[in-house]
Regions:
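A conserved hydrophobic helix/loop-capping motif in glycosyltransferases and polysaccharide synthases
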Residues: 4-12, 27
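A short, conserved alpha-helix in the catalytic core of glycosyltransferases
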Residues: 152-153
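Short, acidic, metal-binding catalytic loop of nucleotide-sugar glycosyltransferases
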Residues: 21-32, 40-43
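Short beta-strand-to-loop acidic/aromatic patch adjacent to the donor-nucleotide binding site
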Residues: 89-99
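Conserved donor-nucleotide/metal-binding helix-loop-beta segment in metal-dependent transferases, i.e.
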Residues: 104-127
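Residues at the starts of beta-strands that form the adenosine-phosphate
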Residues: 2, 32-33, 92
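Conserved nucleotide-sugar donor-binding
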Residues: 131-148
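Active-site-proximal specificity loops/subdomain of glycosyltransferases
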Residues: 37-90
Length: 153
């Protein structure tokens, strides 16, 4: 099963997002795709508006990709484009924030927890209990939501 990480950022925070991205890229389990989903509203010139260190990550790591959307989905930008991009595939999607770093075994331990609860389709993995802060979703759950996400946005 694929492991995908969806992350987003905006112009006021993009300068520090490389620290977060590096912590995801250096996990004990290699992620199949780390997708930085951005919007043209915040980055009208695409990659030209991004810090050099973030663009360099895309060149260095074959599993790190930068995508630009015409519409700003706000918090949903870290998930909706990735769900659409991988429609029909079997995967686990982590939606992570751009303003923190993750322990090196964060994804590995989260996957173990998800495997322990095979019937669980969505899991909050935040340390402070705030629902939705860091989420892990199975594709079977997201596929059910996709028509609503498509119509909503």
């Amino acid at each position: 099963m694929k492991v995908i990480v969806g992350v987003t950022s905006w112009k006021k925070r993009i300068s520090t997002a490389s620290l977060t991205l590096k912590s995801i890229l250096e996990q004990t389990v290699k992620v199949d795709s780390i997708e930085l989903n951005l919007d043209y509203e915040n980055f009208p010139n695409g990659r030209d508006d991004l810090p050099n260190d973030i663009v360099a990550l895309e060149q260095k790591y074959d599993n790190f990709h930068i995508f630009f959307e015409d519409k700003d989905y706000r918090v949903w930008l870290k998930s909706v484009p990735s769900v659409r991009r991988h429609s029909g595939e079997e995967y686990v999607l982590f939606t992570l924030d751009d303003d923190c770093t993750y322990y090196p075994n964060y994804i590995e331990e989260s996957l173990k927890m998800l495997d322990t609860h095979a019937s669980c389709d969505a899991m909050n993995t935040s340390s402070n209990g705030i629902a939705g802060e860091y989420m892990v979703y199975r594709s079977r759950f997201l596929e059910k939501c996709l028509p609503y996400l498509t119509n909503e946005f």
